[in-house]
């Protein structure tokens, strides 16, 4: 997936891959072949848009076979490929229907079938689920993932929804201001962000102002505001002159009503707010010397703790990330 805020260049990059835009420098290669100067209609790619672009005046069958009509194939092969495409998207028997007789999810699947029927090497998807409601979007995420696995071709999926990207992707490219900042599997992206933008953009994270005291290989001694000075193992290259923050994911902070729990770091705080989200409770805790309340998530009982209660936060050093403010 290509993931990033609106205007960061995701769709422009997709259009360059498709051949609708020409790169200002560099080349475009697909399956080892340079396609930079090959026009869009001759590239081994197909594109699915957010608005589906289903023709309302022709039925499903003719919509799907539209791209095949300029190819020199027999009507028997065309019918077979249309039937195969409908089977892929689980819409057999819908050949004679028109777009106004289809639900939003069905129209999206017809758009996918029309793209897949030409058997591209790369399928380009430009926020294709953006117009669907939450429940249908989640169902289509699973269907798209299963479809990609069954057809075995590369899907390049553009989205600004981090949850969507993390759910569906083998690899995620995080973009900002026209740059790709990090390309990693979802878990690696979440656990080991390369800079402040990636760490803050992917999921919830507590960011604490910090300064580098000393560096010994991958071991970085940092002074964390309101917490103390600790040696943390860095997962990216950190230099003495880098400006940093330290990051802690909410799931990595444990809360207790007393100081009996063992952890590398224990700090005292006061609960300022709680929010209930299904199976998780988010707890906000203010700590002396820290500008912003720390957020933690827990599936366990708060053990009698409530707003304005004093509490203890327990953190292990392995769960703290040293994050550069500047680009990697």
Question: Where do the PLM segments sit?
Answer:
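Non-catalytic connector elements of ABC transporters
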Residues: 205, 215-328
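The feature captures the beta-strand-to-loop junction immediately N-terminal to the Walker
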Residues: 3-5
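Helix-to-loop junction immediately C-terminal to a conserved catalytic motif
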Residues: 18
